[in-house]
From Swiss-Prot:
Short name of one Pfam family: Peptidase_S26
Species of provenance: Staphylococcus aureus (strain MRSA252)
Record's keyword terms, sorted: Cell membrane, Hydrolase, Membrane, Protease, Transmembrane, Transmembrane helix
Chain segments annotated as transmembrane: 8-28
Physiological role: Essential for cell viability.
Protein name (Swiss-Prot/TrEMBL): Signal peptidase IB
Residues forming the catalytic site: 36, 77
Membrane topology, record value: Single-pass type II membrane protein
Gene Ontology, cellular component aspect: plasma membrane
Main localization category: membrane
Length: 191
């Protein structure tokens, strides 16, 4: 009886250690704050952020990431441009390396926009702290925008983000459970 009880205690302790390691080093929960990613991610929803997977698999255009905006705040935004990309918006239309890109995650906000445009017109060189002579995203930098462009504070306001600011890639939404979703890339977006 004592041996069986000891085995249970050890098993439970090992399970807690494994959960701690997974939670600390692989996936961490994050609560969405604000409306900048609405309707893709809404205020108060909870997501799991993969903090090592993006380092091994890399970030791609369309990934949703959490990053340190400053010492006190983390933001969640969508990657629009990666190092080496030439990015330009013309009247709400995205062009990457000269090719028009679909952004299905903007459909809802385009239908319900308050003004003429939700994203507007800009090039990489127009962003804060950018090289005014180049439209190419430099190595180690990313262009990120919120899906709710009319309210989002994103690269248009603070410029390109450094790779070392990135906490991780959003893997799945787990709360509310009725809204569970595991892939936020454009080809899986229905708005």
């Amino acid at each position: 009886m004592k041996k069986e009880l000891l085995e249970w205690i050890i098993s439970i302790a090992v399970a807690f250690v494994i959960l701690f390691i997974v939670g600390k080093f692989i996936v961490t929960p994050y609560t969405i704050k604000g409306e900048s990613m609405d309707p893709t991610l809404k205020d108060g929803e909870r997501v799991a952020v993969n903090i090592i997977g993006y380092k091994t698999g890399g970030l791609e255009k369309g990934n949703v990431v959490v990053f340190h905006a400053n010492k006190n705040d983390d933001y969640v935004k969508r990657v629009i441009g990666v190092p080496g990309d030439k990015v330009e918006y013309k009247n709400d239309t995205l062009y990457v390396n000269g090719k028009k890109q679909d952004e299905p995650y903007l459909n809802y906000n385009l239908k319900h926009k308050q003004g003429d445009y939700i994203t507007g017109t800009f090039q990489v060189k127009d962003l804060p702290n950018a090289n005014p002579k180049s439209n190419v995203i430099p190595k180690g930098k990313y262009l990120v925008l919120g899906d709710n462009r009319e309210v989002s504070k994103d690269s248009r306001a603070f410029g390109l983000i450094d790779e070392d600011q990135i906490v991780g890639k959003v893997s799945f939404r787990f709360w509310p459970f009725s809204e569970f979703k595991y892939n936020f890339n454009p080809e899986n977006t229905k708005n």
